[in-house]
């Protein structure tokens, strides 16, 4: 809990593939055209050399937006993100907004506190643009008939559905067995839960 364990060799994750302020980094850039309805109308990929002029924390970016004094590029980014978010909401997706927990250690090295990190729109901005870029990459690979690995989300087993039904019953919610299970169904169930604590528990169930 008190350290980061990188998935890649540290020379890649902390240096070569890390966007550091004031340093050039080779990259593949995804150019997206997004219309007023939040639909990605076209995309293209190019090789690029990226230089980060200034690193900014999620909390700082959110504070600038909330205060109304964010630079123009950040305001434009937020405006386009709102279009993407509205289009995504219209598709009625299953959105598991799971809280991130941080384990705080005391001076003796023992767990002193487990804190929930607040999720900000700034986090969602980055996530939604990453998803849009990933979708564009998938379409580009499919268009080339490239051999790729697909991630398939299997439907929940009957045992898991029964467990979920029993859990929802504790919140006076019903899940009828035998109906067609879709992401939209789970989204509707979560949307109907107004209590934030219960909603978070439902997402993790």
Put a short name on every predicted segment:
Residues 1-205:
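Conserved, carboxylate-rich catalytic/transport cores that coordinate ions
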């Amino acid at each position: 809990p008190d350290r980061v364990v990188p998935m890649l060799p540290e020379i890649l994750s902390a240096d070569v593939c890390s966007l550091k302020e004031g340093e050039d980094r080779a990259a593949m850039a995804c150019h997206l055209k997004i219309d007023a309805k939040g639909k990605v109308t076209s995309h293209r990929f190019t090789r690029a050399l990226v230089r980060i002029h200034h690193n900014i924390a999620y909390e700082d970016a959110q504070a600038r937006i909330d205060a109304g004094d964010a630079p123009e590029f950040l305001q434009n980014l937020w405006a386009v993100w709102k279009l993407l978010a509205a289009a995504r909401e219209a598709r009625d997706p299953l959105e598991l907004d799971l809280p991130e927990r941080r384990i705080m250690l005391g001076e003796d090295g023992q767990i002193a506190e487990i804190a929930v990190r607040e999720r900000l729109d700034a986090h969602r901005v980055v996530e939604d643009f990453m998803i849009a870029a990933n979708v564009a990459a998938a379409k580009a690979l499919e268009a080339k008939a490239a051999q790729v690995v697909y991630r398939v989300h299997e439907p929940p087993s009957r045992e898991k559905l029964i467990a979920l039904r029993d859990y929802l019953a504790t919140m006076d919610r019903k899940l009828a067995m035998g109906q067609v299970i879709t992401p939209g169904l789970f989204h509707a169930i979560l949307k109907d839960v107004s209590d934030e604590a219960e909603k978070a528990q439902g997402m993790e169930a």
